[in-house]
């Protein structure tokens, strides 16, 4: 997991060249479009009952009480404080409040970074209950975040407690089942309301195998992935996807993206001995559920470690892939690998988005996957064929002994959301002549051949950097207009391979204040990584460093892009804040009111943009960093619409720490309809 922190369609032969659509696909797609299936709604028919708004992950709300015409009057309605500020927590420097609440059964449910689950009144923000699973706060965890919870209700009337349940994962790798009404553990689930997710797995470091995203729910199944601490070693924990019975907690199926035997569907593409001594390939982001086709869509990350692959040669099939699994059995239905032999930490972090995409005038059930490379891919949902051409293109080779970078990578024909070319010395930017001079020297010294340049001992410039592109914040989908909206990072990063001796020297020095280090034990090289910054700590490339981008899928074009975030709080006192566009963590949501709401940027504002033009219409300063994805719902006798965001800051990004959940609404008289 990253720490930092239709004109013409074509398919692609895995590992091969671009080709035309397979015979008969148009007829098959026409049939699929003509017979849409109705998806089950969230228990309680709530407006935002899933982390991604709905099971499809569209992050789109049909609410329009707040709209272009009145959003300027939006104001805080209530604020709740969780009390989680890191006291007594050994990993307090990593605390990141990324929670998106869900609305179900008349309550808002959310989870703090230390896995305290809380139920709130949606109108007032008053606490209804809270449950603390008491994770070991003295343990050092690889991550310290939790993005949300999932809800479930028995399909048949049942007596007693826990008919309606909240499921949540924890930093110490437990799956919790809580009574949605009281917050008490469901005694009939696992052992006293929890399942130990480490059972049956190879655990090298208990603090580095975690759950940071809400599980997927399909019928009576709860499906969970894992986050695994990056770059410790080659032989780390494996990213097994598992399903449990929502009532009893009994294990029902497991799917390991990495082959463990010759019968595994990816075995032919791996050296099995290497596969067995490799880890990760995990799904740490949010999965999506396709009830119509009975699928769970699973985005996976890199095999371990991220920046040296000499001991995991080949494409590393099923790592860095979009997997479509049969939700009932865990059987692989189809897969598309979007990064071959990852050497850049380009995990598939964004939630897959399910919806209809227009193809030759017909709506086709599709899955849209945004990536940290800044590329968007669109596949037909039931069989996984590309709906926009995907082409294998040659990319730079490795100069490192023992490394075999894959010679091609799959490029989408949709316009990229982030630049892919090399950063040139003449691109150097800075506030002073000295800044620009030092940045030119830095750029000239690095290996730098554009996207997919392999890591090197001289240092490699990554464009996009290892935070994206599009990270876990994902995308919002306005299906009626065929628009995908994403918060995008554009800041280049530097990765350097180090000998073990050089690693020990550098990690003990004070010369790398902006750097992260990883030992990558079991390989010849450790790694160091950092943003491309001048000696003053300013970016070496011109702004924007973060944007909000809208892609028009009907016309295969960028509809608009706007800088996301200002330099407020990050510039000397004598310089004015500028709307340059800043690095961001968190995602957008879209509404039928013609608005896109997004926090994410480092300056701590929640913003509203016009969904048609990208113009900023409103912003409000949050009490702490808003590195989370907002949500919206209606509640109360007047069905007042609220927009809610968690504001607690992001440890690795260094934004203001806090413990706030803030709701915004129109003044009551204006909210009435």
Show which residues each predicted segment covers:
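Bacterial N-terminal signal peptides
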Residues: 23-34
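Blade/loop signatures of beta-propeller domains
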Residues: 39-79, 257-264, 432-456, 558
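Repeat-blade elements of multi-bladed beta-propeller folds
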Residues: 48-52, 93-116, 141-174, 207-233, ...
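N-terminal cofactor/phosphate-binding cores enriched in small/glycine residues
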Residues: 57-152, 168-187, 191, 195
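A structural motif specific to WD40 beta-propellers
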Residues: 77, 126-130, 186, 252-253, ...
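Extracytoplasmic beta-rich repeat domains
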Residues: 80-100, 130-159, 191-214, 256-286, ...
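Beta-propeller blade signature
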Residues: 178, 238-250, 315-329, 383, ...
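Phosphate/diphosphate-binding loops
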Residues: 351-399
């Amino acid at each position: 997991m990253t720490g930092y922190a239709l004109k013409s369609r074509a398919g692609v032969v895995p590992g091969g060249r671009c080709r035309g659509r397979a015979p008969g696909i148009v007829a098959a797609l026409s049939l699929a479009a003509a017979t849409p299936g109705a998806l089950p709604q969230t228990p309680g028919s709530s407006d935002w009952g899933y982390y991604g708004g709905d099971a499809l992950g569209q992050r789109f709300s049909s609410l329009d009480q707040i709209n272009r015409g009145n959003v300027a009057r939006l104001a805080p309605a209530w604020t709740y404080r969780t009390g989680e500020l890191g006291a007594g927590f050994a990993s307090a420097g990593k605390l990141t409040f990324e929670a998106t609440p869900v609305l179900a059964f008349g309550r808002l449910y959310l989870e703090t970074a230390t896995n305290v689950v809380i139920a709130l009144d949606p109108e007032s923000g008053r606490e209804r209950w809270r449950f603390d699973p008491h994770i070991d706060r003295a343990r050092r965890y690889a991550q310290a975040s939790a993005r949300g919870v999932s809800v479930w209700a028995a399909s048949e009337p049942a007596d007693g407690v826990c008919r309606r349940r909240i499921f949540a994962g924890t930093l110490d790798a437990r799956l919790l089942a809580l009574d949605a009404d009281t917050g008490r553990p469901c005694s009939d689930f696992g052992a006293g309301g929890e399942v130990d997710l480490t059972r049956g797995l190879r655990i090298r470091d208990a603090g580095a195998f975690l759950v940071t995203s809400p599980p997927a729910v399909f019928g009576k199944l709860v499906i969970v992935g894992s986050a695994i601490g990056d770059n410790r070693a080659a032989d780390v924990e494996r990213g097994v996807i598992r399903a449990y019975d929502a009532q009893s907690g009994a294990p029902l199926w497991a799917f390991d993206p990495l082959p463990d035997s010759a019968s595994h569907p990816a075995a032919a593409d791996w050296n099995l001995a290497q596969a067995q001594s490799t880890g990760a390939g995990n799904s740490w982001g949010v999965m999506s559920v396709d009830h119509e086709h009975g699928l769970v869509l699973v985005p996976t990350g890199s095999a371990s470690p991220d920046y040296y692959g000499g001991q995991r040669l080949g494409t590393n099939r099923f790592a860095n892939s979009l997997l479509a699994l049969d939700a009932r059995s865990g059987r692989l239905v189809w897969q598309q690998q979007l990064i071959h032999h990852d050497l850049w930490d380009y995990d598939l972090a964004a939630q897959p988005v399910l919806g209809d995409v227009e193809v030759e005038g017909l709506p086709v059930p599709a899955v849209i996957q945004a990536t940290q490379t800044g590329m968007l891919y669109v596949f037909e949902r039931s069989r996984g064929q590309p709906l926009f051409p995907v082409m294998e293109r040659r990319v730079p080779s490795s100069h490192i002994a023992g490394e075999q970078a894959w010679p091609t990578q799959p490029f989408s024909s949709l316009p990229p959301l982030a630049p892919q070319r090399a950063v040139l010395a003449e691109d150097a930017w800075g506030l002073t002549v000295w800044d620009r001079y030092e940045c030119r020297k830095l750029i000239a010294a690095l290996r730098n051949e554009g996207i997919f340049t392999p890591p090197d001992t001289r240092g490699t410039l990554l464009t996009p950097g290892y935070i994206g592109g599009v990270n876990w914040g994902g995308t919002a989908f306005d299906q009626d207009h065929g628009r995908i909206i994403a918060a995008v990072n554009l800041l280049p990063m530097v990765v350097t391979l180090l000998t073990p001796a050089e690693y020990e020297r550098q990690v003990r020095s004070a010369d790398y204040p902006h750097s992260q280090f990883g030992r990558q034990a079991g390989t010849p090289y450790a790694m160091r990584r950092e943003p491309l910054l001048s000696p003053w700590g300013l970016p070496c490339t011109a702004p924007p460093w973060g944007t909000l981008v809208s892609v028009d899928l009907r016309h295969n074009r960028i509809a608009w892009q706007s800088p996301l975030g200002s330099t407020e709080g990050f510039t000397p006192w004598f310089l004015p804040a500028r709307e340059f566009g800043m690095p961001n963590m968190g995602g957008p949501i879209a509404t039928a009111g013609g608005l896109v709401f997004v926090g994410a940027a480092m300056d701590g504002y929640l913003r509203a943009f016009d969904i048609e033009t990208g113009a900023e219409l409103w912003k409000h300063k949050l009490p702490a960093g808003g590195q989370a994805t907002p949500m919206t719902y209606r509640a109360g006798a007047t069905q007042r619409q609220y927009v809610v965001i968690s504001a607690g800051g992001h440890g690795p990004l260094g934004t203001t720490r806090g413990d706030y959940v803030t709701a915004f609404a129109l003044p009551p008289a204006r909210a009435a309809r």
